[in-house]
Amino acid sequence: MGMRMMFTMFLLVVLATTVVSINLDHAFDGRNAAANNKATDLMARTVRRFCSDPPCRISNPESCGWEP
């Protein structure tokens, strides 16, 4: 193989690796977003339960969005 052919093959490998890497990053970001949404929902439910308990609400008014 000539030098030009080897350089062309090298560029094709680099391009293919970059495209695969970018696609994997997007898929990974989607999984992270789904996990973050689940965590946010869990936190919201926990805060609602916490704020529905009068002793907790009175001792932590800033967390429940009101001032005594």
From Swiss-Prot:
InterPro entries per record: Conotoxin_a-typ
Signal peptide extent: 1-21
An example Gene Ontology CC term for this record: host cell postsynaptic membrane
Similarity remark: Belongs to the conotoxin A superfamily.
Job of this protein: Alpha-conotoxins act on postsynaptic membranes, they bind to the nicotinic acetylcholine receptors (nAChR) and thus inhibit them.
Positions of the pro-segment in this chain: 22-49
Pfam families (alphabetical): Toxin_8
Remarks, miscellaneous: The mature peptide contains 3 cysteine residues.
Reported tissue expression: Expressed by the venom duct.
Disulfide partners: C51-C64
Keyword Repeat attributed: no
GO molecular function annotations of the record: acetylcholine receptor inhibitor activity; ion channel regulator activity; toxin activity
Protein name as catalogued: Putative alpha-conotoxin Qc alphaL-1
Cellular localisation: Secreted
Entry's free-text remark on domains: The cysteine framework is C-C-C.
Keywords: Acetylcholine receptor inhibiting toxin, Disulfide bond, Ion channel impairing toxin, Neurotoxin, Postsynaptic neurotoxin, Secreted, Signal, Toxin
